[in-house]
Regions:
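Short, Asp-centered acidic motifs that coordinate Mg2+ and/or phosphate
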Residues: 47-48, 70, 201, 229, ...
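Rossmann-like adenosine-cofactor binding region
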Residues: 42, 57-60, 174-271
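An N-terminal-biased, well-structured beta-alpha scaffold segment characteristic
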Residues: 1-94, 217
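Glycine-rich, N-terminal phosphate-binding loop of Rossmann-like dinucleotide-binding domains
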Residues: 8, 52-53, 75, 199, ...
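Hydrophobic Val/Ile/Leu positions in short beta-strands of Rossmann-like dinucleotide-binding domains
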Residues: 6, 146-148
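Short beta->alpha connector loops at strand-helix junctions that form conserved
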Residues: 28-30, 74-75, 91-102, 173, ...
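Phosphate-binding beta-alpha-beta segment of Rossmann-like dinucleotide-binding domains, i.e.
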Residues: 89-91, 97-145, 153, 157-160, ...
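C-terminal helix-to-coil terminal segments
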Residues: 2, 87, 94-107, 132, ...
Length: 308
């Protein structure tokens, strides 16, 4: 039987299905925190490895997996996988493209509504007997402008939902041809800075590459519309966290929703600790009960098909 190692959480019916197809599937979501055990498991003739974003598929781990044929990624970001080495060694990498689109898009819209309205943060005061009605008056999203950095599948899903709220949608994506049909869903902007200057919300939807690392830096934050809300569900390294924290404290940013960070979990003493108007979540924008099922079955079937 061909052996499959699953090092992070996966929908268990999909794991059982792999076993029913005749595969020796080892499911241990704690392996991600025991790299030596994971390497040992791969050395035992593993043909497939299924991961999320925490398992670093590179260096010693790839060396241990000498018989690996395929890596299944329970998600879409691939920056935790050494794609060049996988390509050189003939290891196929399968992302769960489309599996978490709805989840991420709904997270972005939710963050926009929560941060724009603001009243949702009044619970502790109200239940303590205070009545901060004037303080809790927020703003509507109708008539505002959303700027999307990157206009792939997830950003397009965000655009469609935002337009249903009466939000104007702009997008900047230098890799999407100007005549692409997708542009019917947003107004194209040639330069990032011109979009930032007029956007009430800015949402990041770009992979982490040498070109996008710290894309949102102090200069870009200064170029944004004062009081704008920044949302990052892409990768932590695409923005300067210290600069974002400072912009929140100074009021330059009206709010931020950050689901991804340069280092996860955040280290002690992070500049984001205590920053006002910050909605911080532990890399869960794409993880819902429904998306976990979709992603797990996409990868289970993809890996099984490859090994068969």
């Amino acid at each position: 039987m061909k052996r499959i190692i699953i090092s992070e959480f996966m929908d268990e019916p999909a794991v059982e299905w792999l076993k029913e197809q005749g595969f020796d599937a080892t499911y241990d979501p704690g392996l991600v925190d025991r790299p030596d055990d994971l390497a040992a498991a791969l050395e035992a003739d593993a043909r497939a490895l299924i991961v999320r974003n925490r398992t670093q598929v590179r260096g010693p781990l790839l060396d241990a997996g000498g018989k690996l044929e395929v890596v299944g990624r329970l998600g879409v970001g691939l920056d935790n996988i050494d794609l060049e080495t996988c390509k050189t060694r003939g290891i196929t990498v399968l992302p769960a493209t489309g599996g978490n689109t709805v989840s991420v898009a709904e997270y972005v819209i939710t963050a926009m509504l929560v941060l724009r309205r603001g009243a949702w943060f009044g619970t502790s005061e109200v239940t303590a007997g205070l009545w901060p009605r004037q303080k809790m008056i927020g703003q509507e999203v109708m008539g505002t402008t959303l700027g999307l950095i990157g206009f792939g599948e997830i950003a397009q899903a965000v655009a469609a939902r935002a337009q249903a709220f009466g939000i104007r949608v702009l997008a900047h994506d230098p890799f999407l041809p100007g005549d692409a049909a997708a542009w019917r869903g947003a107004e194209r902007r040639e330069t990032l800075d011109e979009m930032l200057a007029v956007s009430d919300f800015v949402s990041l939807h770009t992979p982490l590459t040498p070109e996008t690392r710290n894309l949102i830096d102090p200069g870009r934050l200064a170029a944004m519309k004062e009081g704008a809300i920044l949302i990052n569900t892409a990768r932590g390294g695409v923005l300067d966290e210290a600069a974002v924290a400072e912009a929140l404290r100074s009021g330059r940013l009206g709010g931020a929703a950050l689901d991804v960070f340069a280092e996860e979990p955040l280290p002690a003493g992070s500049p984001l600790d205590g920053a006002p108007n910050l909605l911080a979540t532990p890399h869960v924008a794409g993880v819902t009960e429904q998306s976990n099922v979709r992603i797990s079955w996409l990868i289970a079937r993809g890996v099984a098909g490859h090994l068969s």
